[in-house]
């Protein structure tokens, strides 16, 4: 009986992984050489493609077609000492888009999908991206509901009709629709997109903390439901493996425990006027130093200077 139970525990994620959608994500041509550890790109998209009309109404997502980047996070897992790292990339970051001049980084995804987004960030960071994972609105909400809600501490009252939420300050359990609004809202946060990126990393960590609890893992029904909900709205790179996804999941889990550093790429200006409109400019010197440390395997035990989202300019 024990062998059968353990077999089921292993079979559930393996079976779920076999149903996940795959997409081309690896650029061709010159790419950065592989550095220390493993680096992944985690993208939250505003795709409504897997939502029914009833779900779109419940989640307050509207019905815009296509997929745009709503969240961009570089995940780095070192091979040796030091903590794993999540680095939020503001979607309004003004960067060179290979073959398309300078633009906001989310334009790379709109123009050339995952391949061009990966290429853009590889050139901007000097890190070779080893895997790609993308989740849409529906997948995110379903995972939270499959877990029976996720506990989070809301730092201020959040009333945002555009994100379909009305939350009071304080610790509480959020449902799928509430969680989606919590990570989407940018107009209620005095820090704008930077504060929103912090909430996204915070909530991803809370999801993985809940998913790893014995009540989830040791309950066959809950474990099956959670693993399959997790991949229902997931899109991965063609060469991204289950092991890669496991590394990302463990890194996210470490946010709540402090084992993972939760950072923002160093910034110079969060409201710069560019040809693309109001944009975010990186602090190139500080960002370059951060990415060089990751590439070389220099251990990170605490957040480097300039990674708190406060502009240096």
Region locations from a protein language model:
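Non-catalytic, solvent-exposed segments at the cell envelope interface
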Residues: 2-313
């Amino acid at each position: 009986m024990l062998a059968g139970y353990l077999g089921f525990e292993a079979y559930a994620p393996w079976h779920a992984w076999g149903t996940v959608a795959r997409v081309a994500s690896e650029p061709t041509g010159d790419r950065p050489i592989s550095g220390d550890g493993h680096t992944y790109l985690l993208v939250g998209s505003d795709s409504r493609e897997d939502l029914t009309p009833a779900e779109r109404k419940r989640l307050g997502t509207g019905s815009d077609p296509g997929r745009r980047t709503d969240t961009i996070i570089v995940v780095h897992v070192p091979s040796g000492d030091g903590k794993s790292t999540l680095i939020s990339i503001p979607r309004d970051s003004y960067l060179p888009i290979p073959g398309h001049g300078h633009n906001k980084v989310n334009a790379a995804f709109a123009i050339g999908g995952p391949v061009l987004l990966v290429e853009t960030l590889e050139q901007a960071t000097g890190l070779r991206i080893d895997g790609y994972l993308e989740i849409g609105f529906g997948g995110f909400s379903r995972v939270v509901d499959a877990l029976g809600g996720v506990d989070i501490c809301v730092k201020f009252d959040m009333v945002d009709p555009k994100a379909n939420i009305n939350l009071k300050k304080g610790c509480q359990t959020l449902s799928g629709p509430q969680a989606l609004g919590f990570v989407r809202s940018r107009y209620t946060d005095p820090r704008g997109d930077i504060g929103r990126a912090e909430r996204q990393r915070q909530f991803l960590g809370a999801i993985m903390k809940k998913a790893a609890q014995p009540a989830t893992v040791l309950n066959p029904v809950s474990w099956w439901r959670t693993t399959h909900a997790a991949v229902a709205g997931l899109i991965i790179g063609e060469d991204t493996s289950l092991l890669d996804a496991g590394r990302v999941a463990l890194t996210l889990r470490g946010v709540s425990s402090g084992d993972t550093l939760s950072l923002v790429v160093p910034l110079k200006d969060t409201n710069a006027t560019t040809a693309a409109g109001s944009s975010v400019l990186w602090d190139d010197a500080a960002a370059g130093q951060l990415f060089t440390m990751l590439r070389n395997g220099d251990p990170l035990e605490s957040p480097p200077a300039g990674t708190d989202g406060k502009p240096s300019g």
